Amino acid sequence: MAKVLVLYYSSWGHVEQMAKAVAEGARETGAEVALKRVPELVPDEVAKQFHYKLDQEAPIATVEELADYDAIIFGTPTRYGNMASQMKQFIDQTGGLWAKGALVGKVGSAFTSTASQHGGQETTLTSFHTVLFHHGMVVVGLPYSFAGQNGVEQVKGNSPYGATTIADGDGSRQPSEVELDGARFQGRHVAGIAAKLAG
């Protein structure tokens, strides 16, 4: 049985919803799944002023625990085509793990949310993949065997690089069912590969 960590940052809850779907998909394989988040860097008064979702139940992860999992699926909103600073700050603390090769051979994957359809989803995911490659992880995306990422009949996220959702500029759009299905698929896919690699 693979041990999977779904680790995310979410300002307004879109990535949180996707993270829960990813975790749900991973659990369907029989994996032992933990759902955690990285610390918030925005001061409380600012977060309240901008209506951040402050009631997220997932516990805060520690950098050291990343080595305990067979797979880590990272979720982050997009900030100018890159991961959010909260996630980057957490990742930047993994130098000790890198020095020990603690994540080499583990499965790594990522998912994201953007305000618009062309708001940097794929650049965020591929830049995240670069981090995973530096750690020696086996990078897994969202294959085209997930048919929900095909077609143009509706506005929707998802790409071969990972599950995605589109929040709209004011955050009013919530993840659609096909986007959540993509997240579940990615969770199942990553957990299945991790189980095979873990033996």
Curated annotation (Swiss-Prot):
It is an enzyme of class 1 (oxidoreductase). Keywords: Flavoprotein, FMN, NAD, NADP, Nucleotide-binding, Oxidoreductase. Disulfide bonds: none annotated. Its cofactor is FMN. Substrate binds at residue 98. FMN binds at residues 10-15, 78-80, 113-119, 134. Coiled coil: none annotated. GO terms for cellular component: membrane. It comes from Methylorubrum extorquens (strain PA1) (Methylobacterium extorquens). One of its GO terms (molecular function) is NADP binding. It comes from the Bacteria. This is NAD(P)H dehydrogenase (quinone). Belongs to the WrbA family. Binds 1 FMN per monomer.
